[in-house]
Amino acid sequence: MAVMMQAFYWDSPKAEGKEGEWWNFLAEHVEELKNAGINAIWLPPVNKAASTTSMGYDPYDYFDLGDFDQKGGVKTLFGNRAELVALIQKAKAHSIGCYADMVINHNSGADEEEINPLDGETRWTKFTPKSGKFARDWNSFHPSRFEREMVEGENFAGFPHLCHRNPTVYSAMFDYARMLIEELDFAGFRFDFVKGYGSWMITLLSNYRFEKDGATDFMPYVVGELWSGGDDIDTWLEKANRYTDNQIAAFDFPLRYKLKGVCDQPNFDLRQLTDGGSIVMKRPANAATFVDNHDMGADTIVNDKLMAYSFILVHEGYPSIFWFDYYNNGLARPGTPNGINALIEAHHKYAGGDSQILHADPNLYIMQRIGWADKNTQQPGLIYVLNNMGDRWSGTSVKTQWPNQRFVPVAWDGHDAAYPDERMTDAEGNAEFPAPPRGYCIYVPLAPEANKDEVIAGLK
């Protein structure tokens, strides 16, 4: 019952003419994001990288947040510490948490070369950052006296690979995490390239009790980026969560590639959405679902992308909206039932309880969320229809959990602009639920006397 937004795309400050001003630019959008139903924003790496024109995935000084003149300037590509703090505090005032992008696998931009005495190789491993914190030498990286051969993980793009078993490195990672949460007021972490190092490092950071908001036992939201198949991610989640009571999530790459198939392959078999290959189907509580991100490049989804967003916003998992899709691709569509805003509204109001697949064939997928209620939440559930047919509306009769129930469409989109009709189940809960060609429709239960125009998403 929460939605995050990835609040950047690759080189977004350059593309938007906001170099060194991205934190300020995001702050201008906080109120709008709050009104749209965004609960958290994932920020790019906040510390100084090997260059002030870098996106930050080549970290140099973890404790320079844009305040020291090094690597080509003072500010990072996104701004400075004061502007970052102002953004986080404004977001917090609007009940939006901020997630920090943690790049702790590798470093870049070393100041000197060194000869590693363990293998005689010369590498750029001498770091003397102007923050005065976390100076590094060859022993901070692999091969190190603390780990000559990497027990877990792999190198990334030839960058010096941090040895987390070195006590100095290990301590610096905790100092960095404490700064982000206890000083800057971040609420969670996204860990980059987790296949590069042992999951135990993330487990320990996730299970640490941070001081935040007057409490001494705050545990952040934690999600890892493991760009791999379902079995690999499942194994990683099993290991990462073995010794922590703060459950760690993973981005659902297998689902994302299935959704690309839905959108970009006209003959994609929708039954593939029902198998156990995706994280959300096997471990919904550990799934961070998404459609595209900053790394996809030429592999981005190009057709009917709202079909993918509709899927992640009605199913379990923690859905992430991509800034470029929301703003640059114009998929927010505020004030209509045909965009991301309407899907977010439906997610918050109706998408509670377990998902139950009612029908799946190559071209039609129908699911019900059974609803959820407690002292703080009332989500009555929904019926979701996804239609892969490109030339006509399609639906079928399914047996729902609701007998003699009126259903109204609240969010929909597709290759036909027609307004979906209301539905009424019979005494056994049966009714036919259609969706537009190459589109989707979300139906929700509504009392007979209620005005449907008051519940259609996006029309408030």
Question: What are these model-derived regions, one by one?
Answer:
Residues 1-156, 162, 195-224:
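Acidic/aromatic-lined carbohydrate-recognition and catalytic surfaces
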Residues 16, 70, 74, 86, ...:
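A near-ubiquitous, low-amplitude feature marking generic local secondary-structure context
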Residues 6, 109-171, 240-267, 330-354:
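Glycan-binding loop/region signatures in secreted carbohydrate-active enzymes
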Residues 79, 168-172, 304:
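Short secondary-structure boundary/capping elements
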Residues 2-5, 25-32, 38, 45-47, ...:
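Active-site-proximal helices and loops of the catalytic beta/alpha 8
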